Design a protein with these regions (language model features):
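Hydrophobic alpha-helical segments that form the core
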Residues: 100-103, 154-173, 185-195
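Key DNA-contact positions within bacterial/archaeal DNA-binding proteins
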Residues: 52
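Amphipathic alpha-helical segments used for helix-helix packing
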Residues: 104-125, 139, 176
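Basic, helix-initiating cap at the start of DNA-binding domains
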Residues: 1-33, 37-49, 62-66
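Base-recognition residues in the alpha-helical recognition helix of bacterial helix-turn-helix
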Residues: 31, 55-59, 67, 71
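Hydrophobic alpha-helical connector segments
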Residues: 67, 81-110, 160-163
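Amphipathic alpha-helical packing segments from all-alpha helical-bundle domains
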Residues: 74-77, 122-150, 157-161, 185, ...
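Hydrophobic/aromatic residues within well-ordered alpha-helical segments
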Residues: 18, 61, 68, 72, ...
């Protein structure tokens, strides 16, 4: 390998290492203090980096929050999908996955970063890349359920968007509530009822 190539590879590896460090530090700081109170000077100093590294990797503080939100929201989706996969059928899996995502709104880190600061700073959560990935998974499940005759022959994307939106908005409601613990079971029950409305009528 040429020296120039080795140097380029080393720079790329260093950038990736710095990115991982900054996301981990920001995740901890945002969870403990909230986005607005988080100091970028302190955050970068804690991991032995400069603000220049932050700007180079994320553009600004908002870009760093977007990366943290994407990481946590993706982890939430993966966890929900794992729970859904353990259910006895595609239908039960769809319900379990939605309920699991809603229940994660009780997690303090999820509440503060993804469901409170995220929408306030980054805008509509339904437009986040992580939510779009989750939507595609839900759409695939809906398509299978329609093909199996379990769900009504509706437009799969429309049904998936409404299901995903219901789970997301239930989580947002829980996070903003003064009593998340009491709101959560109500949200899950309503989600199940809404999803059941998509079931095909049995003759």
């Amino acid at each position: 390998m040429k020296l120039r190539d080795r140097m380029a590879r080393k720079r790329s590896e260093t950038m990736q290492e710095n990115r991982v460090k900054l996301i981990a530090a920001a995740r901890k700081t945002f969870a403990e203090r909230g986005y607005s109170a988080a100091s970028m000077d302190e955050l970068t100093a804690d991991v032995g980096l400069t603000r220049g590294a932050l700007y180079h990797n994320f553009g600004d503080k908002r870009g760093l929050l977007a990366a943290v939100v994407d990481q946590i929201d993706t982890e939430m989706a993966v966890r929900a999908q794992e729970i859904g996969a353990r259910a006895g059928s595609d239908w039960q899996g769809l319900l379990a996955e939605g309920a699991a995502y809603i229940e994660m709104a009780l997690n303090p880190e999820v509440q503060r970063i993804v469901l409170l600061d995220g929408p306030a700073v980054l805008g509509d959560p339904s437009q986040w890349p992580s939510q779009n990935n989750c939507l595609q998974v839900t759409k695939s499940t809906v398509e299978r359920l329609i093909a199996q005759g379990i769900l009504k022959p509706l437009d799969a994307e429309a049904a998936a968007r409404l299901l995903s939106g219901a789970a997301l908005n239930a989580a947002l409601w829980i996070a903003a509530s003064e009593d998340p613990q009491s709101v959560m079971p109500k949200a899950v029950e309503a989600f199940h009822a809404l999803a059941a409305g998509l079931l095909a009528e049995r003759s």
